[in-house]
Amino acid sequence: MSTWHRGRDIVTANRVEKEGSLADFVEQVHSSKLVRVPGTAVFPHPNKESAPLALRANVEHNGVLHQHVVIFSAVPKTVPHVAKDDQVSVDNLGYADDGIVHVTLRYGFFDRPNIPYALARHGDEVSAELGGAELSDVSYFLSRATLRPRRTGSMRRWRKALFVAMARNAANPAAYFGLPADRTVVMGTQIDL
């Protein structure tokens, strides 16, 4: 267990460094002349402090951003079910007209954090913040980190190998969040361990 926790701490620290601040990213997007393409893109991400790697990669590699962007965080609660009125909150991240929002889904331990279902159930709230965006046909973008064990670092070699093996066996985020395979794009990056 200590190998898993230590490895996750290292990976999380490296990811946060690569991701950078979400507020800075939104400011950069707002002040730049990025080409905006039609449609809605949803980026599952654990928090609203840092920018999803898939969002950064999409902008850096393709030079475009969808007209409507939803950064979606699922937060587990210590109750069996969360009431519908308390499940979703939407934040425009500082600019009401840039088409970028952060959605927080709170769910209980008997609930499944199904993102398409949550968007369908709370679509009016999200669509209103996005200026009337169509949420029935969205694209989902996942960040996938490939771990690269290095000779240097704060973990012994055998612990790195064990952590990499455990990470490969971790749950598939697309299945966990109920994302449709035909509308999900996985964008990868490499993280040193």
For the regions a language model picked out, list residue spans one by one.
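Alpha-helical membrane-embedded segments
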Residues: 1-6
